[in-house]
């Protein structure tokens, strides 16, 4: 058991100086899609939406070639005083997000 652990530890310590993330980024620089949290492939630098959860998604590659998924949710709506929360409409983000309407303010914020 100790011999196996020592061999494993030696293998880890002798791993090349390039990190695992850097190696993956190098291997996947040609990839033009990302695997979204919905389990589907999506083109980089394009938005897609989950209307049921009122979320917007976006995949991009950083300067080092690592691909990230950005998930945007509705801001928290807090109504104080005479203000009221107006539920969002059906559809995609941001139209589905709730808004705060105040009687003394002509704009929703």
Curated annotation (Swiss-Prot):
Name by which UniProt lists this protein: U-scoloptoxin(16)-Cw1a
Cleavable signal peptide: 1-21
InterPro entries: SVWC_dom
Major location (coarse): secreted
Subcellular location: Secreted
Any one annotated GO CC term: extracellular region
Post-translational note: Contains 4 disulfide bonds.
Sorted UniProt keywords: Disulfide bond, Secreted, Signal, Toxin
GO molecular-function terms, A-Z: toxin activity
One Pfam short name: SVWC
Reported tissue expression: Expressed by the venom gland.
Family statement drawn from the similarity comment of this UniProt entry: Belongs to the scoloptoxin-16 family.
């Amino acid at each position: 058991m100790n011999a196996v652990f020592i061999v494993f530890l030696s293998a880890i310590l002798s791993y090349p100086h390039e990190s695992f993330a850097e190696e993956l980024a190098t291997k996947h620089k040609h990839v033009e899609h990302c695997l979204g949290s919905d389990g589907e492939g999506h083109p980089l630098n394009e938005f897609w939406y989950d209307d049921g959860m009122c979320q917007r998604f976006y995949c991009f590659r950083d300067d080092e070639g690592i691909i990230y998924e950005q998930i945007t949710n509705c801001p928290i709506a807090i109504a104080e005083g005479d203000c009221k929360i107006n539920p969002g409409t059906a559809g995609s983000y941001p139209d589905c997000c709730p808004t705060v309407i105040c009687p003394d303010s002509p704009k929703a914020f």
